[in-house]
């Protein structure tokens, strides 16, 4: 109840802030229409971001799936409008491991296991595109076992595109081998192939990448389109590597 009241009050503050700041800007224009107006816009944006960050933090901390879903909606809107902050980063990192890093039990049953929340948080971390987002996604892949969540994390890592010292490749390759043995999942295998294709230029350990792609191609637990895609990726990577070698020899 306390969380709901606080969220409502914060939301009211967020909605009324533009009107308050607009009045302040009108007064400022009378003194200096240029510099003061720019200053007020900066203050207004900082105020809105602060309110937004606090509100998102409270919704993430509140119990229940609905508050976390609303938090994700606020975060998505902020990212679509080009607003990023430490609060948003922290909120997404928390939501991406909801039910894993912090477990709430009632009568011995986990009541905060929300795979769909974690999956969506992973997608938005990809939209963040920061080093911290990359690190959060790698943490998800270490701790989560839900194929849908892991698939979203793999896709987001491919979109971020950071792979210093094969850090991201090694993580994805480990996931590929793990699920290939324990729980072959066609949708995950397909996303791994797509990500390998995107990242192939930055991957140093080409040998292990080829081995993983070929293992997917020869694993009949995967549907035919996925195995066909594996051969396509293999050919594409091989041709790209050959062209690169030819350029180096010229």
Q: Residue ranges of each PLM-predicted region?
A:
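Bacterial N-terminal signal peptides that target proteins for export
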Residues: 1-8
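Sec/Tat signal peptide C-region and signal peptidase I cleavage site
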Residues: 18-22
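Short coil/turn segments at helix-helix junctions and helix-capping linkers
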Residues: 144-145, 221-222
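Mature soluble domains of exported/periplasmic/lumenal proteins and thiol-rich metal-chelating peptides
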Residues: 178-184, 196, 250
């Amino acid at each position: 109840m306390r969380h709901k009241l606080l969220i409502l009050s914060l939301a009211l503050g967020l909605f009324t802030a533009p009107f308050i700041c607009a009045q302040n800007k009108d007064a400022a224009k009378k003194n200096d229409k240029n510099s003061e107006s720019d200053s007020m816009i900066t203050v207004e944006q900082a105020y809105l971001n602060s309110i937004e960050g606090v509100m998102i933090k409270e919704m993430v901390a509140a119990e229940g799936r609905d508050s976390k879903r609303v938090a994700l909606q606020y975060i998505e809107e902020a990212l679509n409008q080009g607003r990023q902050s430490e609060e948003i980063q922290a909120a997404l990192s928390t939501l991406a491991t909801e039910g894993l890093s912090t477990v709430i039990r009632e009568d011995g049953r986990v009541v905060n296991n929300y795979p769909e929340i974690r999956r969506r948080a992973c997608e938005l971390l990809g939209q963040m595109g920061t080093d911290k987002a990359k690190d959060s996604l790698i943490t998800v892949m270490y701790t989560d076992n839900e194929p849908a969540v892991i698939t979203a994390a793999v896709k987001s890592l491919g979109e971020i595109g950071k792979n210093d010292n094969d850090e991201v490749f090694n993580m994805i390759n480990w996931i590929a081998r793990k699920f290939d043995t324990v729980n072959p999942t066609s949708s995950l295998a397909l996303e791994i192939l797509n990500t390998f294709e995107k990242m192939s230029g930055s991957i140093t350990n080409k040998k292990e990448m080829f081995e993983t792609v070929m293992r997917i191609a020869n694993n009949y637990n995967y549907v035919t389109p996925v195995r066909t895609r594996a051969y396509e990726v293999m050919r594409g990577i091989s041709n790209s590597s050959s062209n690169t070698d030819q350029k180096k020899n010229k």
